[in-house]
Structure formats: structure tokens, C-alpha cells
Amino acid sequence: MEASRRWPYAAWFMAVLGLVAVFSSSEAYVFYAGGRDGWVVDPAESFNYWAERNRFQVNDTIVFLHDDEVGGSVLQVTEGDFDTCSTGNPVQRLEDVAAGRSVFRFDRSGPFFFISGDEDRCQKGQKLYIIVMAVRPTKPSEAPEPAGAAGPVSSKSWSWQAFPPAGATTPPPLPPSWGSAPEHAQAPGKSSLGGSGGGEMSRSSSLGAPPPTSGAAGLAGVVASVVVGVLGALLMF
């Protein structure tokens, strides 16, 4: 009789732990192409160099901030069209979710290529390629990877393995307006958008989103500790 009373508590406990696990493993991050300078022509820092300093995973999102009045459209293209700045047959033309804001969500691992919708602007450096890493489950007993395994891609002659996203689902639709930049990334000011974007832009301003913080994981640990304590107290009676 006593054991049958404990079953509902055990089931409730397992359900909560499942929710905590999902919460702690479903984080996705937002990156602004080019950092605070935005999607500009002739950037002070190459967009590809900016991408090498960041780590992209499946379900992350990249935002292209541009000035509509100077042809700041964004195209996803093949590698061949990326090399030649060909805009005639894009894989996808990114739609604006708000004025001057084009958004793309990475739904798989592997390479992605983006160029300006204006071929002349693409030739001046408004182009970007990104290598997206697959989401891999954490294994406590797994041996550490070699020192250079997770380093940045040094050139377009990369070597990578494409892993299907583990349990990845289609993310919810984006809101009609992207109201504000996330806490870990700053949107560029109006003065840094459009124009030539030449030598006046400092390299230090081309910062991407910093590495993810451990706030969600810490919260998950607190929740799990509280649940264990409550369950232990209930089983004492």
C-alpha cells in the first residue's frame, strides 16, 4: 500500500527531470552578420573572418542588418555562385522580417553561402560563408577532442562531417517584427549602415555574439536539486 502511494511521486519526478533536460539542451543563439557594423559593403573586417571567430550550430539564427535604400538584400547561393558573385539563380532570397532586417535559421549542419543581391557590392566583399556544426549529445565518459578540433575554419578548404541534428524540430515562426537585439549582441547604429563602410570602421567594432552563457544550465541544476529535495521529503512520510 505504501509503495503504491509513492508511484505518483516517482512519475511526477521523472517528468520534471525530462523537462529540465529538454530545457537545458534546446538553447539556440542569435548572431548579427558582421557584428555591430552590420551587413555593409567593403567591411573593415572580412565577413568570413568574423564567421571564423564564432561557433554556429543547428537551430542558431543569423540576422543581416542592412539599409534597404542602398540595395542591402541577401541571397543564399551555391558555392559556385558565391565565388563568382552570381545573383541570377539563388537558392533562396531572404525576406525581411522588418525594415532592413533579414533573418535566416540554420536547419542543418554543413556550409552555407550568402551574398549581396547587388553583384557589385558582392565583389566589394559583401559576402559570407558559414560552417554550421551539428548538435551532439553530451557524453560524460567521452574522451576530450584534440586541441584543434573545435577551432575556427582557417580557409574555404575546410574538412567537416555533417551529422543530422539530434531530435531537431522545425523552429516556431519568427515574430513579424524583431523588436530588439538580444543581450549578448549589439545591433549597429544607423551611422554604420550603408555607404562604403571603408577605413572608418574599426576592427574592434566587428564583434559577433559571444559564446553561450551557462545561465540556463545553472537554472536547470537548481530546479533538479529542488525537485530531488521535495521528492525525498515526501518519501520520508
Swiss-Prot record:
Q: Any coiled-coil ranges, and where?
A: none
Signal peptide range equals 1-28
Q: Where is the composition biased (Low complexity)?
A: 140-152, 201-215
The record's listing under Pfam families reads: Cu_bind_like
Could you tell me which residues are lipidated, with the kind given as GPI-anchor amidated serine? S206
Instruction: Give the positions annotated as glycosylation sites.
Output: N59
Give the GO cellular component terms, alphabetically. Answer: aleurone grain membrane; plasma membrane; side of membrane; vacuole
Record-linked InterPro entries? Cupredoxin, ENL_dom, Phytocyanin-like, Phytocyanin_dom
Report residue numbers covered by any propeptide.
207-237
Q: Which PROSITE patterns match?
A: PHYTOCYANIN
Tissue specificity, in the record's words, reads:
Expressed ubiquitously. Accumulates particularly in reproductive tissues, especially in maturing seeds.
SUPFAM superfamilies for the chain: Cupredoxins
On whether Zinc-finger is a keyword of this UniProt record, the answer is no
Q: Where is the Phytocyanin domain?
A: 29-134
Keywords of this entry: Disulfide bond, Glycoprotein, GPI-anchor, Lipoprotein, Membrane, Signal, Vacuole
Q: Where is this region: Disordered?
A: 139-215
Molecular-function GO terms, alphabetical: electron transfer activity
Give the function comment from the record: May act as a carbohydrate transporter.
Name the family the entry cites. Answer: Belongs to the early nodulin-like (ENODL) family.
Q: What is the recorded name of this protein?
A: Early nodulin-like protein 1
Gene name for this UniProt entry: ENODL1
